[in-house]
Amino acid sequence: MQEQYKPSEIEAKVQQHWQDKKTFEVTEDENKEKFYCLSMFPYPSGRLHMGHVRNYTIGDVVARYQRLQGKNVLQPIGWDSFGLPAENAAIKNNTAPAPWTYENIDYMKNQLKMLGFGYDWSREIATCTPEYYRWEQWFFTKLFEKGLVYKKTASVNWCPNDETVLANEQVIDGCCWRCDTTVEQKEIPQWFIKITEYADELLKDIDQLDEWPEQVKTMQRNWIGRSEGIEMTFGVVDSEETFDIYTTRPDTVMGVTYVAIAAGHPLAEKAAANNSELSDFIEECKNADTTEAAMAAMEKKGVATGLYATHPLTGKQVPIWAANFVLMNYGTGAVMSVPAHDQRDYEFATKYGLAIEGVIKPSDSDLDISEEAYTEKGVLFNSGDSFPELDGLDFQDAFDAIDAKLSSEGKGKRQVNFRLRDWGVSRQRYWGAPIPMVTLADGTVVPTPEDQLPVILPEDVVMDGIQSPIKADKEWAKTQINGQEAFRETDTFDTFMESSWYYARYCSPHADEMLDPAKANYWLPVDQYIGGIEHACMHLLYFRFFHKLLRDIGLVNSDEPAKRLLTQGMVLADAFYYNNEKGARVWVAPSDVTVQETDEKGRIQKAVDSEGHELVYTGMSKMSKSKNNGIDPQVMVDKYGADTVRLFMMFAAPPELTLEWQESSVEGAHRFIKRLWKVAHDHVAKGATAPLDVKTLDTKQKELRRELHKTIVKVGDDIERRQMFNTAIASVMELMNRLQKAPTETQQDRALMQEALSAVVRLLYPIIPHTSFSLWNDLGNEENIEDVRWPEADQSALVEDSKLIIVQVNGKLRAKITVPADATKEVVEEQGFAEEGVIKHTEGKTVRKVIYVPGKLLNIVAN
């Protein structure tokens, strides 16, 4: 038995035990309830950061808790190991991405083990291995056969620095989410998966996600963006051509005064042949940022095409303008413009002197559009001679009437549209899974035959930083299909492909098929998924989409991939900088900072670095390389031990909120573990105890035991239902304060202490497993702690023998009394009136009323 708390020795010993016993390796067991706990797997960037530690500690706490509930718990881990950072590092270090990636995996794997996470390492996967991406390629060919994959030339977001296509979600404020380079527009052939075919189901099934955060569900609903409207056909004057427009406000159609089309619309390009101003405008729009944020902020500009459109209901001719706020790849690439009832159209019409005609007004007043558009759904008026019966109708009645009219004339139809676009999965980089499609000599594009899968990505390459090695190597692209020469696709998959199905591969990671359906359907869906909310509209949507694809191909039988989702907050740390001689900011690591002055609230006022630079303190911000304010988990574990780091991570804040890194609080967590260790070993040193006899306990012993069992109930509820791990820990700390002060003279004192400490180490086991493992054995228990059950509250101990009653006179506290739990009102009154404080404040007064709230409060009204 080790009497001193030495975390490095304790943790190494316990981790070796877990490894030798393969404690966390599991197989399917139909006789046990399963629990699949999964944290989003890491990109092997080189070192774990504190964000990883927080995510994986939360997952490990949940998994270990469920194990003590007697469940068959799967907690796997792997590596999201394709992606641009590996290419960039390879170019910088004059190596290939593969060795850099595998070295990082080895290092980070040791870090995860150092932190004591209970993973089933036998299921480890790395998405950059052919054993993994082979089945992704196979699945893609099946989707192609089902008509869910297609290739088309499309205007895409292009990062000129990384030379790759970005999804809309990967463009942040007009810049690449990875390297912050300004994004351009480029026409390029792309492979797409028809996620829009599943848009309705993806939206509808959000209602099944009862245990997902409302914020994530709202973000996905908005991203999918279902709308009901009418698609109507406009003619082109002096032409046989027509074009379609979709609107969710058909009630405003009688107020159309111009039509706006995308710069890339065929009509605009045709008109540009004889219009240099329009031609220049089209070129300008090609390189514009088309993200939502940029579109909302940019100046709305346009050029008249010289063409006119024919209104589908009135026959009126309205001008067609090319406008920078209309996108060719969104909707039909054309919008009807009603400046009286749309603010953007109003501003555009005012700028270019276009007509503004009001056709909707408030139900209780006249229309005023002198300053701005009226955008509410009022009642129709001014509908004109062609459709006068619209006047006086509200939105829905007008919608129905216009729909009926257009449908009967073959000029329009009611339609449901989605904001969601099909998923472009092509990337023009090397370090990704090759797309398994080939082009035959006659130009036909077909899937790679199954017997030629996987299409292996060569790993022994030279990165020149200019072109993908598989694009540069013309021999690699050559292949044979049925004796015919063919050429492989040299694009690779978006890495969101790999992360969309990894959770399912863990169920049968070594199967010679994509999934073993029996094993997949035993484990799936995931019971608890953990990751950042920043993934709400990318990974978490693709994750749900892929699960439905897997279901429809017969590999899984559930509709959704995860029952419960927890989105953990970021980890923040102090950030400091100084300006160098060139005026550039130099960020200084917190470990290199000396704080010289704080204010009365402890806020930093003055700090210097080790070289004497006076620093600017910018407050707490997300740990990042750019601000040099990351804290190395390895350093903290070496200094305090893994259990201390884990305890701090779980105690410092509720899991969904940001966590502020404070080393003083880490030291506090360390002191608590040392105190627990000392209390336990002081107890053990007193020798064996007699069995606990609850019938012989005195009042104080009963009160202590009641607190113990109330704590067991609260901690279980906090971890499982509320997921408020910080309050669970606080409850155990409060109990430990009482245990430290509890008497240990009698056999029953020590027997009660044995019961309490045996419960405490199990309550803390999910959070500080190394310490709990050791203390459990030191307390004389023969079984290892992983093989026992979560402590069960003794319901009889929770029954209170007495109640504490607050006694007030005229609403002010005058006494506290303890009465038997079954005391009547009369008994409570008698005892309350006998209290000195009550006598003092009622003497000489008339008692007007006595209010008794059973078991809680006695209020005496006297004057």
Curated annotation (Swiss-Prot):
Q: Which residues bind ATP?
A: 625
Return one GO MF term.
ATP binding
Q: Which UniProt keywords apply?
A: Aminoacyl-tRNA synthetase, ATP-binding, Cytoplasm, Ligase, Nucleotide-binding, Protein biosynthesis
Q: What is its EC number?
A: 6.1.1.4
* GO BP term, pick one: leucyl-tRNA aminoacylation
Catalysis: reaction(s)? tRNA(Leu) + L-leucine + ATP = L-leucyl-tRNA(Leu) + AMP + diphosphate
Positions of short motif 'HIGH' region:
42-52
PANTHER family assigned: LEUCINE--TRNA LIGASE, MITOCHONDRIAL (PTHR43740:SF2), LEUCYL-TRNA SYNTHETASE (PTHR43740)
Give the protein's recorded name: Leucine--tRNA ligase
What's the name of its gene? leuS
